Amino acid sequence: MDCIECRGRMLCSRKVCPLMPSLRPQVSVERDILGSSPPSVFVGRYGYPKVRICPAVPPFTGDTKIYDTPEMWREVPVERVLEFRYSMILGQFRADVRRSKEVEVVQEMSLYDKPIDVEVSFAKPPSVRAFFDDVLPPFGASAPAKEVIIHSAPRPPKAVEKVYYDTDLRAVEAMSYLYERGVAVSHIQKLLSAGTLGVKRKLVPTRWAITAVDDTLSKQIIEEIKQYETIDRYRVFVLKESKNLFVAILCPSPWSYEWGEAWYPDTTWNRTRKVGVLTDSEGFFGRTTYARLGGCYYSSRLATAEYLRRIRRQATAIVWREIYPGFNVPIGVWFVREMLRKMYAGKYCEFDTLEDALRFVDKHSNLDVGRWIEKSTLVKRGRQRTLWEFM
């Protein structure tokens, strides 16, 4: 199994990811802390249905909302985001996903969109290793906790209160309701993970919840944009950010989607000497299998669907990402979602043909565009369609 495709998910059957240990910085805190949680919660996946549930708290008080709100990180350097995340200390409890005292605390924390003062008492001093994941933002130190107490909290947003008390509202409908009322995607993910949405409520591992929300919301938006006319010309967006290049080619044809990644050597998931290129795609009627590129596929699809909905058009979207040497810390799928949102808020160039669009991409890409074309299902399909129309 290729490391680029596995990404620390242990699909290679190893007991320990060989890439992760070298990525863990040294952090330390006291045995007991009182701090302002953004708020932030984490639900693990190992041992399900008995999993780790963790309130996350920095060892200080104040306005910490930005520490767990990816929507606020678009203009923040990655190094600064990592500082935020390393200060978030996890108090670990082992609990059943359905009900326990600790579950109730985590559920209450998830309701708020402003910082709350939380006290955590640890059974032993927190470890000096930070926590990394391919889907989640990093966390700082962690340790088994004896007790967690919420000292003060604001009132939850009204939309959140409504779905929390409506136990007949399905989780999918609750997500849509919250999203349409301006609740941040990251907050909806937190609510789903804490088991505060739906009819049969239970904790959902945080990495699953993040992807589930991106997937669910984007599918709902896609069904809407399928009713719109297609764009008239090819549009190309480009964004260079934090040793990454993002490119989107929007084509004047019915909805379909492709996400591709090119990992250069000395990056998070590529310790070889060659550039690794992977793509995955779906047609007009969507997909029935989990994307091989994992959570980034769904977060990028959401950002793309949001843009098309905003302009009330549909298109075939070919979206590629190049990751350059030195970008070697897994920071979570939020980075893709928020960078694409930033890109789609910017300017684009228009072209009459796919070939012209590809030539433009080639000027910005460090990778020969031929490598992308070789891996791209939708570029090949677009070329065949153009040839057929010409004949």
From Swiss-Prot:
Q: Where is this motif: PIP motif?
A: 384-391
Q: What is known of its domains?
A: Contains a predicted C4 metal binding domain at the N-terminus, which could be a zinc finger DNA binding domain.
Q: Where are the zinc fingers (C4-type)?
A: 3-17
Q: Does the keyword Acyltransferase apply?
A: no
Could you confirm whether the keyword Cell division appears in this record?
Answer: no
**UniProt xrefs under PANTHER family:** DNA REPAIR PROTEIN
Q: Which Pfam families match?
A: Nre_C, Nre_N
**A GO term, aspect molecular function:** zinc ion binding
This protein's name: DNA repair protein NreB
Instruction: Name the UniProt key words of this record, in alphabetical order.
Output: DNA damage, DNA repair, Metal-binding, Zinc, Zinc-finger
Similarity comment text for this entry: Belongs to the Nre family.
What's a BP term from Gene Ontology annotated to this protein? DNA repair
Gene name per UniProt? nreB
The subunit structure is: Interacts with the DNA polymerase sliding clamp (PCNA) via the PIP (PCNA-interacting peptide) motif.
**Which species does the entry assign this protein to?**
Archaeoglobus fulgidus (strain ATCC 49558 / DSM 4304 / JCM 9628 / NBRC 100126 / VC-16)
